[in-house]
Amino acid sequence: MNLIYFAFKYRYRFKDLNNFLKSRIYGNYILLNFSGPFKYYLSKILILLKIGRAISCDGQPMIRNKSQGYNFFIRGTDLNIPTNLLDLDNNIVAIKHPLLENNKIFQIYPINIKKTKMNDDIKIIFMSSIKLETNEEESLFWETHKEKILSNFAILDDKYFWQNNLANKNLFQINRFYRISKSLLRFEIVTYLKKIYDKKFVLIGEDWRKYWIDSLESNFDTKKNKIIYKGNICLDTGSLEGSSSLYPRANQIIESGGLIVQSYAFDASEHWKDLKQDLLFKNFDELRNIIDKLINNLELSNILLDKIYKHFKNSSISMEETLNRYFSK
């Protein structure tokens, strides 16, 4: 049995790891949670004594080599790895990016999923932050390409779109345009849904109060979030950092028993298989068509929720494959 353990001090990453943070056995691996302000010191002793291998979050503490474990950047891509850690060969990330090779992905799957039913009074839930600060060049880029982007949201994950339109920019500069464009698209999607569904659309995040005063305050309590997601349609416009179907927010929705409706991601075919056509959207028409079918048909919503449960109920096997990729050597 191979020992693997989480080794990080601060609790704010707990919500990003979701059910994967819980101690359990995956095949030949026993995964223990030694994170948090007290257990963290036990993990430091184990690292010092070279017992097992650690997974740290954001390089805190820094794991120096693969024999000790990995530095896991759960909220980002290779572009989020700090410069002082770039030379290490044991950095792994959670999110794919259309402009990168994506050969350091540590894929986490939704596990221990609740088998639930849809609420009788279905709501559309969306939790996120929003920041729309742009400079003149970024605003011009958005206005120039807005019509094309709104007709096909997935174009933002086409590397040739960026290479053709920002050929004079380096990777980090392009990534800033990428993040801003995804934020502006998120705003357009929310605006569209608020107009159509009004009180049925529950918007959560203090940043949104600049635009809609009925937006609810941000909630960082994982247990409360799970209650909110459970049995409702849960909108997921994807990570601003990159394009992955199964990243922290999506996993939390699925594990909570929420019926996820997701913007088409870079790896959608790999993870969603035949469920793509029922849950994923690339434009406003597809989004509205999906939501209209679900919000007005409790039976269909329950059928799809059950399909999601069955699709991921054996994800512990997939999780073992992820661990094998990095810890079998």
Predicted regions: what they are:
Residues 13, 38, 178-185, 286, ...:
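Soluble or luminal CAZymes and related metallo-dependent hydrolases
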Residues 1-28, 42-53, 194-197:
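N-terminal subdomain of nucleotide-sugar transferases
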Residues 254-255:
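Short alpha-helix at the nucleotide-sugar/activated-sugar donor binding site of glycosyltransferases
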Residues 274-281:
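A short acidic/histidine/glycine-rich donor-binding loop in glycosyltransferase catalytic cores
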